[in-house]
UniProtKB/Swiss-Prot annotation:
It comes from Saccharomyces cerevisiae (strain ATCC 204508 / S288c) (Baker's yeast). The gene is MCX1. Disruption phenotype: 5-fold reduced production of the first heme precursor 5-aminolevulinic acid (ALA) and 2-fold reduction in total heme. In combination with a disruption of HEM25 or an inactivated HEM1, abrogates mitochondrial respiration. It is a peripheral membrane protein. One of its GO terms (molecular function) is ATP hydrolysis activity. Residues 1-13 form a transit peptide. Homohexamer that forms a ring structure; this hexamerization requires ATP binding. Interacts with HEM1. Keywords: ATP-binding, Chaperone, Membrane, Mitochondrion, Mitochondrion inner membrane, Nucleotide-binding, Transit peptide. This is ATP-dependent clpX-like chaperone, mitochondrial. Disulfide bonds: none annotated.
Length: 520
């Protein structure tokens, strides 16, 4: 009878503990590596939206992958520890309730077996090893795609992201925004879900504007080194208490008519698992790097340091030479290969630029983006998902107009943007000026087709910035498809063939060519 009772108890006990082990195993499985896109998958997704920047995309893909791998590992260890404690409490409770069986060899063997099963669920977890946090610093000229890289990664990972302009940050007590505003924005973008916000991405843009001045000029530095110091605790990973005005809806009449007010609410956010991406153009950093490398070569060659007076003269001449240049300086390596100077950025260079060593120490991954060339800008116009040309074609389609832009015209636009030195961000401005009056006149008219060719872009470059109304454009009515196809084919045969298939007309049909007309 005693043996039978012991067996019944053990079966019930085993079943209960088994459920805990299964629960632990299931929860651990939810955080497995398979849920994180691989670096190759991340880069492939970035390739769909971003042209060029191969090295930058690879560095960020690996950094993001390892960051969320670290989060998963931390979650596994936490869940494993909680389940282990739960099992221990259950065993103690059962031993207390049924002390007669506590020394039963069968129970002890069963417990050891269940404990082995539980430990098997976490066999890949090294509980003594803690993975360090690796934030990222991205250096690159304006318009090179820094912010787009971050927002695209957040999209594929389905995590909230908040972008903060560091030029607006000041020390606590001064007019401006406190550093905690970046966490507040992330929390808002996470719809006030603290757990989700704690796995998000914070982008600190224009971090170079926080560089501490080289020398004090008798004024209080409220947005430089002091702000950098304030950012240290947040970036490293601490629990931060913030007060946020959270919208609250009120039913005012019981008939689904609601009003919204804002109520102060306190949240505690742990920044340990938030990925910080620090970005900036760092204008002039390339010149500093070139100077550093030149000085090193001279020291190695002559065996003595460069005179400070000579260094100052070289720096002055270099500043004059590159003051109005949109390109970055290059460095020739010992093997004869030339690389962009920013590719050789070191933590020491960033400290010399004006960032404090403590901040640089919390951002171990540094990568540089290249200035975009004409071919890059050309491909950006038409190739990525959400390409600029696709957007404008879609807009014109909404009011019944087919927008046709030739390849030569796109190359001219790319060259124009390169000349202005505004990078990819400048492409939209040029397209807006190019299509301003076309967009104004076409809706509600009998115009069915618009052709933007090389001559159209040339006419834009010949006008003043504010006189984009003088751009030469070709217009076609609905029954002038053949004229459109013929004019397009003269400059872009591939587009002409595509239009012929799309519109169902032959370009060989001879119809009067519609004259060029300017929008005035």
């Amino acid at each position: 009878m005693l043996k039978s009772a012991s067996q019944n108890f053990f079966r019930a006990y085993s079943s209960r503990i088994g459920r805990y082990a299964a629960t632990a195993s299931g929860k651990l499985a939810q955080s497995r590596l398979s849920n994180i896109p691989t670096p190759k998958a991340l880069k492939k997704f970035l390739d769909e939206y971003i042209v060029g920047q191969e090295i930058g995309k690879k560095v960020l893909s690996v950094a993001v992958y390892n960051h969320y791998l670290r989060i998963n590992d931390k979650q596994k260890k936490g869940e494993l520890q909680r389940q282990r404690e739960l099992m221990e409490r259950e065993k103690i409770a059962d031993d207390r309730d049924e002390p007669i069986f506590s020394g039963n060899s069968e129970s002890k063997a069963g417990w050891r077996n269940l404990q082995r099963q539980f430990n098997l669920a976490g066999r890949e977890v090294d509980e003594d090893l803690e993975l360090s946090k690796s934030n990222v610093l991205v250096v690159g000229p304006s318009g090179s795609g820094k912010t787009l890289l971050a927002t695209t990664l957040a999209k594929i990972l389905n995590v909230p992201i908040a972008i903060t302009d560091c030029t607006q940050l000041t020390q606590a007590g001064y007019i401006g925004e406190d550093v905690e505003v970046c966490i507040e924005r992330l929390l808002v973008n996470a719809e006030f879900d603290v757990a989700r916000a704690e796995k998000g991405i914070i982008v600190l843009d224009e971090i170079d504007k926080l560089a501490k001045p080289a020398a004090s000029i008798g004024t209080k530095d409220v947005s430089g080194e002091g702000v950098q110091q304030s950012l240290l605790k947040i970036i490293e990973g601490h629990k931060v208490e913030i007060t946020v005005k959270r919208p609250v809806k009120h039913d005012i009449d019981g008939q689904k008519n609601q009003t919204t007010t804002k109520k102060d609410e306190v949240f505690v956010v742990d920044t340990s698992n938030i990925l910080f991406m620090i970005m900036g153009a760092f204008v002039g950093l390339d010149k500093h790097i070139v100077k550093r490398i030149e000085d090193m070569k001279k020291i190695q060659k002559a065996g003595e340091s460069v005179e400070s007076s000579n260094s100052k003269e070289v720096e002055k001449e270099r500043a004059k030479k590159f003051r109005f240049s949109n390109t970055l300086e290059q460095v020739e390596l010992d093997n004869g290969k030339k690389v962009c100077a920013l590719d050789l950025t070191t933590p020491t260079d960033l400290v010399s630029f004006g960032l404090i060593p403590e901040l640089i120490g919390r951002v171990p991954i540094i990568t540089a983006l290249q200035p975009l060339q004409r071919d890059d800008l050309f491909h950006i116009l038409k190739e990525p998902k959400n390409a600029l040309l696709d957007q404008y074609e879609y807009i014109f389609k909404q009011f019944g107009v087919r927008l046709c832009v030739t390849q030569k015209a796109l190359k001219k636009v790319a060259q124009f943007a390169l000349k202005e030195g505004t990078g990819a961000r400048g492409l939209r401005g040029i397209m807006e000026r190019l299509l301003l009056n076309v967009n104004y006149d076409c809706p509600g008219s009998n115009i069915a087709y618009v052709l933007i060719d090389e001559a159209t872009v040339d006419s834009l470059q010949e006008t003043e910035h504010s006189l984009a109304s003088q751009v030469d454009v070709k217009y076609y009515s609905g029954d002038e498809k053949d004229s459109l196809i013929r004019d397009v084919s003269e400059e872009d045969k591939k587009l002409g063939v595509m239009l012929e298939k799309e519109l169902g007309h032959s370009a060989n049909i001879h119809t009067p060519t519609i004259p060029k007309r300017s929008l005035t």
